[in-house]
Amino acid sequence: MLSFFKTLSMGRSGWLLLAFSALVLELVALYFQYGMQLQPCVMCVYERVALGGILFAGIIGAIAPSSWFFRFLGIIIGLGASVKGFLLALKHVDYQLNPAPWNQCAYLPEFPQTLPLDQWFPYLFKPIGSCSDIQWSFLGFSMAQWILVMFAFYSILLAIILISQVKAGKPKHREIFR
């Protein structure tokens, strides 16, 4: 199994699939916002940024997947973004399941002054909703819970890919006597 993931990470198609899946999920988020008129909250915006990190990791890995530098850089960026996204989604689920006046998200995002994404791209990163509101659900789970599952999947996948990198490749053929 590890050799499969190592082989997949050494090819461009696996990285492009990672980037494509993140892009599709970003487009789905925009459909929910503009097509279904759901209002994104601060945590939703942060989760979009984390998903953008996974998209960026897929692009980095696709640049030169046979190079260990670009491969490891893509894995580390993707794993960091997916773990951060998982932690953000976990906090978002906590806001929804335990609403209280002292358990609320901030109204405005706290981006660095050198990277104010909410001012540069307000159509993507401007929050207008409340984190504790459940505006949409599917199969009894809120969107934040589905996002938690999504980031857990990305985290597990990228952790397996990272572990597969230290595995030595299989020899081409084995000889009993030399």
From Swiss-Prot:
GO annotations of cellular component type: plasma membrane
Membrane side Cytoplasmic: residue ranges: 1-14, 66-72, 165-178
UniProt keyword list: Cell inner membrane, Cell membrane, Chaperone, Disulfide bond, Electron transport, Membrane, Oxidoreductase, Redox-active center, Transmembrane, Transmembrane helix, Transport
Membrane topology designation: Multi-pass membrane protein
PANTHER family named in the record: DISULFIDE BOND FORMATION PROTEIN B
Family according to the record: Belongs to the DsbB family.
Protein name: Disulfide bond formation protein B
Gene giving rise to this polypeptide: dsbB
